[in-house]
């Protein structure tokens, strides 16, 4: 069994009067790849920033095991500064001096054909993202946090980014936690899928099990209230119900047509649907 590397206990964050995270309890294991989905404002990016120690809690704590220090946690976000006035090489030199990196890995920089004398502020969003990743990989992180950024970069650089992340997971057993709302391009990454709503995780499943545990019913009328419906989309003439957890016993008792969804369709539903039932951690 994989070693527990992060434990979040009774974690709450308020911003003004709004409770953004509400008594979150969850843990992550070494080498695990996790994707967090949820609607805008659900708390997923705040949660990632808490793991990165960018935001402090009003209640609760996060414990890191296996001797992990801040230097071994990499955080990628489009809101982070990247030494705007520096050239690419100056940024590398500064980062290397701060983290005592003796042998910087130029693989990604060279693959991108970046001019090392080019100002960082003149790089495209995709180039900046890959450059930031190259800086973090040079730290040999044990935890990599990626905050909803890859959907904004072009397909070629997105593929480069994902290849680098997959290599990192395989070579170093790095724990990767990504926040994302588009899953079509990253279905090969997550082992575990979390869905957050109103500051709490309402779904936590292995990606390989999701297809068997979540089904969809399409109907012209409402389904039985005994069916465990986690979200629904309803119009006057058409209704869609997302059933979780699904079981063969449920199918026998309520013989509707239960449709299987792929991971991308599931996440689209969670991001855009109207929740009718919330699940505690």
Specify the residue positions occupied by each region the protein language model found:
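Helix-to-loop junction immediately C-terminal to a conserved catalytic motif
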Residues: 52
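C-terminal coupling/interaction segments
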Residues: 231-281
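ABC-family P-loop ATPase nucleotide-binding domains
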Residues: 79-131
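Conserved ABC transporter NBD signature motif
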Residues: 60-71
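Catalytic Walker B motif of ABC-type/P-loop ATPase nucleotide-binding domains
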Residues: 144-148
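ABC transporter nucleotide-binding domain
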Residues: 162-176, 181-243
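The feature captures the beta-strand-to-loop junction immediately N-terminal to the Walker
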Residues: 37-39
